[in-house]
């Protein structure tokens, strides 16, 4: 795992005064904040959401909070992610500490998952121990998840296992994306040898071992053909 992937966000997004006022107006309604307020068309609520995504995208090194894969913003924009599901805890809908960015897949798989250790708490936890899932502001990723060969996700703690399960980090496409990135950045021969070794344990770490093995074998065949052409 690289230092870039192993980030802890040092500071949540800091709303502008206008954004704070717009949020306060929603909080001061008779019924208080409700999850649907997230879709408010108020100018400064819209700017809050835009600015938050841009800010957290940079602070997260342009990586998803949960899988730590880069998603180019020009292709598929990162989703704004409520770490604690807003429908269950609407009082934290606009709390910057409860907001990060995540790739569309992790966001969808995590869905409505309850991530609080104490779901009845009325105070938002300010330490990682309050969450069952890795929190990008409070948890060091490598304390909870190991990347085997930089490709396969293995939980080191209950929190790591929970994050892998709920965000479906054992999806085979994620392993293949990580392998693709390594092939661009490192010595191809040594990486291929490592990938072949990973196929022997991949049944524990990907949801489709056959697909992963086929993927690696295709890489091997492509590498062999290139070697032959280079030697002609």
Which residue ranges define each predicted feature?
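Long, charged N-terminal interaction/targeting segments
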Residues: 1-28, 232
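Short, charged surface segments at domain edges that flank catalytic/cofactor-binding sites
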Residues: 20-63, 88-93
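Short cysteine-rich loop/turn motifs with clustered Cys
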Residues: 50-77, 103-106
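Extracellular structured ligand-interaction cores
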Residues: 61, 96-98, 140-144
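Histidine-centered nuclease catalytic patch
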Residues: 68-101, 109-125
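Domain-level detector of nuclease and nuclease-like folds
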Residues: 111-191
């Amino acid at each position: 795992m690289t230092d870039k992937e192993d980030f802890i966000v040092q500071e949540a997004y800091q709303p502008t005064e206008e954004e704070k006022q717009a949020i306060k107006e929603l909080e001061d309604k008779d019924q208080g904040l409700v999850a649907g307020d997230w879709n408010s068309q108020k100018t400064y609520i819209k700017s809050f959401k835009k600015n938050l995504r841009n800010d957290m995208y940079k602070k997260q090194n342009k990586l998803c909070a949960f899988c730590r894969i880069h998603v180019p913003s020009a292709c598929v924009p990162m989703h704004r992610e409520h770490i604690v599901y807003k429908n269950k805890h609407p009082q934290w809908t606009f709390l910057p500490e409860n907001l990060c960015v995540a790739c569309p897949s992790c966001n969808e798989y995590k869905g409505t998952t309850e991530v609080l250790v104490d779901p009845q708490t009325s105070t938002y936890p300010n330490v990682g121990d309050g969450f069952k899932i890795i929190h990008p502001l409070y948890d060091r990723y490598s304390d909870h998840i190991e990347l085997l060969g930089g490709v396969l996700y293995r939980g080191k703690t209950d929190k790591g296992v929970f994050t892998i399960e709920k965000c479906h980090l054992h999806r085979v496409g994620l392993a293949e994306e990580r392998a693709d990135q390594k092939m661009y950045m490192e010595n191809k021969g040594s990486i291929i040898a490592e990938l072949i070794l990973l196929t022997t344990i991949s049944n524990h770490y990907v949801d489709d071992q056959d697909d992963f093995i086929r993927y690696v074998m295709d890489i091997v065949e492509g590498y062999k053909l290139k070697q032959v052409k280079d030697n002609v």
